[in-house]
Amino acid sequence: CVISDLSTNKAGTVTSGLDRFMEWKTKDSNYENTEFAQFDTFYEGMFQKKRLLDILKNFILFSGTSTDRFKILAGYHQYFAVRKAIERAKKATLTDGKGGVFWHTQGSGKSLSMVFYAHLLQEALDSPTIVVMTDRIDLDDQLYAQFSQCADFLRQTPLQAKSKEHLKTLLDGRSANGIIFTTMFKFERGEKTLSER
């Protein structure tokens, strides 16, 4: 959905509140004006044929519970950051294995960016197993809940390791797929490798 008076232009979904409609502030990931997006920036940035099809396929999802679901459209910053991260991950698998840092400010939708990234990574890297490791139990629970609410979009049900042994079990014999959540506290120095994958 788009709302516009040709001065202010915003996009959202049929379930978005007015406060959730967002401007698309770039044509090509270079930020031309971060205060207000121009009319042509919004339309050329979001409605290029190839990009629009990509947004419709990979950057709109349903989240929430079975009784309270809502449709979410990625913001421009999420779209370009995730696309760049996917290209970097593909390159990393062929070179040094270093994917880089994905940075967003507080409240900018990092959890959803991670969901979009995991969704695209499944295709880009031929069904990898993704281990999401955090440094806080509350963050682990928060991310696990967000990913679980997006299980249909991810085409798999995320798993949360309850212990080091449980994590080993979840990884053991797995040759593809899986999104597994854990905390770094389950590891100790000098410990043997949990999985050769």
Across the structure, where does each feature detected by a protein language model lie?
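ATP-dependent helicase/translocase motor core
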Residues: C1-T129, D138, Q142-L154, S175-I179, ...
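Acidic/polar loop patches that form or flank catalytic/metal-binding clefts of enzymes
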Residues: L154-Q160
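Phosphate/diphosphate-binding loops
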Residues: C1, Q160-K162
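Conserved ATPase-coupling elements of RecA-like P-loop NTPase cores
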Residues: L143, G190-T193
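Short, solvent-exposed coil/turn elements at secondary-structure transition points
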Residues: S7, K162-K164, F187
